[in-house]
Regions:
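Charged boundary/loop elements
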Residues: 45, 49-61
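Extended C-terminal regions of large enzymes
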Residues: 300-304, 309-388
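A conserved non-catalytic segment of reverse transcriptases
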Residues: 121, 206-279
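Histidine-centered nuclease catalytic patch
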Residues: 404-441, 445
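Short metal-coordination and nucleic-acid-contact micro-motifs, chiefly zinc-binding Cys/His arrays
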Residues: 392-397, 425-429
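Short, intrinsically disordered, charge-biased short linear motifs at domain edges
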Residues: 385-391, 418-423
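Conserved polymerase palm-domain catalytic core
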Residues: 3-6, 16, 57-58, 70-202, ...
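Acidic, low-complexity intrinsically disordered tails
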Residues: 375-376, 446-463
């Protein structure tokens, strides 16, 4: 398959409609052909390093080494101090991807213009009918996020330039952007209105505009939602908690899985599915004041599981069900598990340790400062491990104790005993790949008696 730009012309995309569960609305996505996807991906790889060198410092979406947690950390830094600005402009770009001006893209995106024009004007087929594309970029193109980011880069400078002073007051007009969601802090409501007008002028040049429904100016005492979190101050104290909308959405997700799907799958699969949801949600919200929310979610999960068990075993009493499927831990907590395997259990969010997220250094570039981002990724992996288990992760340096290879982000890991199964001390525990667990029994039975094997594993872990 040739990816030479000479005589290249993108074929019309295929339009599909998907339901956005979070926003309860339909999304229209145009999907390119396989060859066009390859060409788009090639130019995305070319454009990404360029966009990194020109991006706003406090833009955090769809960028290597940056995340919503970094955006959260900078929002906290902007409003948590006693002398921080108290007025917040919350804004959202209306239909950002669909409305970017093709003329602006052609004039400002530095890749092969002929290929770029072909991407933009490919059109789409829907219901066997061909439609032209006059503006916007398709969500189905991997390059679209980069183009959208570049179209919004420059907002930070526009806001700073509004202050008309030789020494910029960085606390006034503090700007944070995650995709098309924008937060700007201000000392006064009047200056916040001025910032809003400047953003609207900036967007109009690019064919975009702010969403009237989602754009507002609020006082920090009222609080505001951003990226599924609620930020507010009460009696001078700053708080961050999961937003009501995020909690309700997660509760609905759990109910749908436990009640609707729980009857169709095994108990082991049910526990595995619940744990995956809980750990993912807690991993995102553990950087907030989430302890009360975590306890609430634990109660929700227990009540849903009890409701499910009553449906499955209508002839059993509630006490019989609890005695069979719940056991009491040393601290008195009731835990849902397999009756024959108490170690296969539903995790409790109450046990999750809250942490502070160390935000990215703003002037670091992932294409230049690779060592910094590698070390940061390693420290984040350690942070995902709770309590005393961190020392095991550090000891193994992120490598499987069985095979010696590194753990990748998408690989499941398992905690196993190295020697006696009765010894649960940290010194007797190690992490291995889930895929290595099939060899675990044979490995434990040898009790690592082969000195050559022990030395080899130690060498791998120390690499």
């Amino acid at each position: 398959m040739s990816l030479i730009p000479d005589n290249y012309k993108a074929k019309p995309f295929r339009r599909v409609v998907i339901q956005d569960k979070h926003k309860n609305k339909e999304r229209h996505i145009s999907i390119p052909t396989i060859k066009d996807r390859c060409m788009i991906s090639l130019y995305a790889h070319i454009l990404d390093p360029i966009s990194e060198s020109t991006a706003d410092k406090k833009s955090f979406a769809f960028r290597k080494g940056r995340s919503a947690l970094d955006a959260h950390s900078f929002v906290c830094d902007s409003v948590k101090y006693p002398d921080s600005p108290e007025w917040i402009l919350i804004s959202d770009v209306k239909s950002c991807y669909e409305s970017i001006s093709h003329k602006w893209i052609m004039d400002n995106i530095p890749i092969n213009k002929k290929v770029l024009y072909s991407f933009l004007k490919a059109g789409f087929i829907f219901g066997k009918e061909l439609f032209p594309t006059e503006h916007g970029v398709s969500l189905g193109m991997s390059i679209s996020q980069i183009i959208a980011n570049m179209s919004l880069d420059g907002l930070q400078k526009i806001i700073f330039d509004l202050q008309f002073s030789k020494s910029i007051n960085y606390s006034n007009g503090n700007f944070i952007r995650y995709a098309d969601d924008i937060i700007v802090t201000s000392k006064t409501r009047e200056f916040a209105i001025k910032i809003k007008s400047a953003i609207e002028r900036f967007l109009s040049i690019r064919g975009m505009k702010l969403s009237e429904k989602k754009t507002k100016i609020v006082h920090i005492s009222q609080g505001f939602d951003f990226l599924s979190r609620h930020y507010y101050k009460q009696d001078g104290i700053f708080y961050v908690i999961p937003s009501s909308k995020a909690i309700k959405s997660f509760e609905d997700n759990l109910q749908n899985f436990i009640i609707n799907k729980g009857k169709q799958i095994s108990q082991r699969s049910l526990i595995k599915g619940i744990n995956a949801k809980l750990q993912g949600w807690a991993g995102y919200h553990r950087v907030e004041d989430s302890l009360n929310t975590f306890r609430h979610i634990d109660c929700v999960v227990s009540s849903l599981l009890l409701k499910l068990m009553k449906c499955i075993f209508p002839s059993k009493s509630e006490k019989q069900i609890i005695d069979t499927y719940w056991y009491e831990e040393y601290d008195g907590e009731k835990v849902y598990s397999l009756p024959q395997r108490r170690d296969i259990r539903v995790v409790h969010l109450n046990d999750v340790i809250l942490v502070d997220h160390q935000h990215v250094i703003l002037n670091k570039n992932p294409y230049i400062d690779r060592e910094y981002f590698e070390l940061r990724l390693k420290s984040q992996d350690i942070q995902k491990v709770n309590g005393d288990l961190k020392s095991i992760w550090r000891r193994q340096r992120g490598r499987c104790f069985y095979c010696g290879r590194k753990f990748f982000k998408d690989q499941q890991k398992k905690l196993v005993h190295m020697h006696s199964l009765d010894d649960n001390s940290i010194e007797n525990l190690s992490y291995i790949h889930d895929s290595c667990s099939c060899d675990e029994i044979e490995f434990i039975q040898t009790d690592i008696e082969n000195p050559n094997e022990t030395d080899y594993l130690k060498q791998l872990i120390q690499v």
